[in-house]
Amino acid sequence: MGTGMGTGTGVRTEMGAGMDTPPELAVDRLLDDPGTRIIVCCGAGGVGKTTTAAALGLRAAERGRKVVVLTIDPARRLAQSMGIDSLDNTPRKVAGVAGGGELHAMMLDMKRTFDEIVESHADGERAAAILANPFYQSLSAGFAGTQEYMAMEKLGQLRARDDWDLIVVDTPPSRSALDFLDAPKRLGSFLDGKFIRVLMAPAKVGGRAGMKFLNVGMSLMTGTLNKLMGASLLGDVQTFVAAMDTMFGGFRTRADATFRLLQAPGTAFLVVAAPEPDALREAAYFVERLGAERMPLAGLVLNRVHGSGAAQLSAERALAAAENLEEGGIVDQEAGKAGLGAPAAHSPAGGSAPESEGVEAGAYTDAPEGADVEGITAGLLRLHAERMQLIAREQRTRDRFTSLHPDVAVTEVAALPGDVHDLAGLRTIGERLAAGVPAGA
């Protein structure tokens, strides 16, 4: 299956010797390529898209590029990590960026962006009438698809200004990642569609003839709407439509233009996911959709991947050792399932586990008098077993994705112990993005 992978960014490497190992996503090569003008981070909600976008922007800036990051509803801590108390619809320069580049950040204000469209396409009197209209205020503040449409609109505005050589976009959180591609077209079609044209007709006919047309042609619909939303709704809608008459044709045109911009060679999509079934299922859908729309997919960023410094000790052996300790038994080094000796406190003649088995020699010799060394050790072994089981589940989930999409380049980002709260944390994420290894390697 095609993935829409662009060839101009040079982000893919050759497949490894094992066919199950996907190509590695060369993040720095992508960021350094002057032909890369837009990076879109997309995927399901709650997988670290916003942090990934900010980390990519910082890394690109510190490698010499002039970057703006367009975020959608970021956590306050993330804004503060960039040294900004609050983000708004205006790009703000981030202080403390090393290297020769610049980093600017902004947060989409969908209502303000909609207001800007009105103000730029209508004269002062008409713009004021539109902005004060109750139906417009509801539409601009939360109509289905408005946030996605305005994200596309703002992206088009930033690209047209040409003040930055790289724009990193964090797509809106939504029930489905596909909404980012679908919702702008839906809203544009609504605003340019038959429903609006029907509402325009009475205003264009005018006077009693217009009201007669409205009463005959729309009585059922308006009756239902009035029951649901109040008798004043129709008047607000008609006033809105009359004021917006000269603007409606542009909504779908601008949405289509931005959609074509997303298909252009200078754009790169990064699908962001976590090693969880739902997130990777959504990522797989998005990969397929990008291929169908012929959009340039750079690869998959797999966040919050867990590992272990004692991976040579399997979950099964750790559990077996824990059970023996809890039962008060002594594990035989030659025949025991766990392959671990008894704790040093009870076996001074060499019962300590060798370091190669993941337990340091003499680990128990400094235990406080009266401490339940066996119980503590058994608990730690069970925690290790749970971690190894989690790692195995994540690996199986990754393997399912890579078996379906073996040509999609992958980088993995190890899970962090806490939240990112400063530029140093974003740098760490950027370093892990650039140094990540393919799943299964």
Functional labels for PLM-detected ranges:
Residues M1-M5, T9-D33, T222, N226-A242, ...:
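C-terminal lobe/tail of nucleotide-utilizing enzymes
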Residues G2-T3, G16-I39, V47, T52, ...:
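Nucleotide-state-sensitive switch-loop elements of NTP-binding domains
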Residues A44:
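P-loop (Walker A) phosphate-binding loop of NTP-binding proteins
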